[in-house]
C-alpha cells in the first residue's frame, strides 16, 4: 500500500503524481503509475471524456475560489473557463520511459486510485493462495465467497447490504 501511495497520491509530498504535476514530466515512472494512468486514460476514452484524470486544475480553481470567498457563491464563468482549458485527457502522453502532461495541466487519480489499490491488494492475496477474502480499503473487493459459501455482505451505512461472491463495490 505504501508503494502505491508513493506513486498515486495527490497529497503525499514526493509521490510520482505530485512530481508529475509540478514538473509536467515524470521520467522512469513506476509500473504502478503507468498502469493506473493507462487505466484512467482507457476509462476517459471509453466514457468520451466524462471521466478525465486531468480535472485537477478545475478542482483547484473551485477550492481556491471558495477559500478566498466562502460566501460568494459559485466561481465566475471566466474562472471556470480558464481552468477548463487544462482539462483534456488526450494531451497526456505515456511514452516508453516517461509521462508528459501539458504545462497548464494537473492530474488526479482520485477517481480510481482507491479502487486500484484495493484491486492490487486483492490480486496479491489471491496469488498467495487466499480464496475467501474481503478486502476493505474504503472500496470493497471480494475473492470468492466466505468459507461457508455465503456471500460477503457489504453496504453503505444507509443502504441495504449487497452480496459479493467474487467482485467489487465502490461508493462515494
Annotate the PLM regions:
Residues 1-172:
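Mature catalytic core of soluble alpha/beta enzymes
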Amino acid at each position: 500500500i505504501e508503494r502505491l501511495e508513493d506513486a498515486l497520491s495527490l497529497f503525499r509530498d514526493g509521490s510520482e503524481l505530485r512530481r508529475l504535476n509540478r514538473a509536467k514530466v515524470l521520467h522512469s515512472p513506476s509500473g504502478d503509475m503507468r498502469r493506473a494512468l493507462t487505466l484512467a486514460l482507457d476509462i476517459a476514452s471509453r466514457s468520451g471524456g466524462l471521466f478525465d484524470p486531468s480535472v485537477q486544475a478545475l478542482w483547484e480553481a473551485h477550492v481556491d475560489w471558495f477559500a478566498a470567498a466562502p460566501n460568494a457563491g459559485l466561481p465566475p464563468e471566466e474562472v471556470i473557463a480558464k481552468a477548463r482549458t487544462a482539462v483534456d485527457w488526450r494531451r497526456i502522453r505515456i511514452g516508453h520511459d516517461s509521462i508528459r502532461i501539458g504545462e497548464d495541466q494537473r492530474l488526479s487519480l482520485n477517481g480510481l486510485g482507491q479502487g486500484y489499490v484495493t484491486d492490487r491488494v486483492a490480486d496479491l492475496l489471491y496469488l498467495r493462495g487466499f480464496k475467501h477474502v474481503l478486502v476493505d480499503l474504503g472500496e470493497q473487493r471480494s475473492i470468492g465467497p466466505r468459507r461457508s459459501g455465503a456471500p460477503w455482505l457489504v453496504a453503505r451505512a444507509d443502504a441495504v447490504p449487497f452480496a459479493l461472491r467474487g467482485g467489487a463495490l465502490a461508493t462515494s
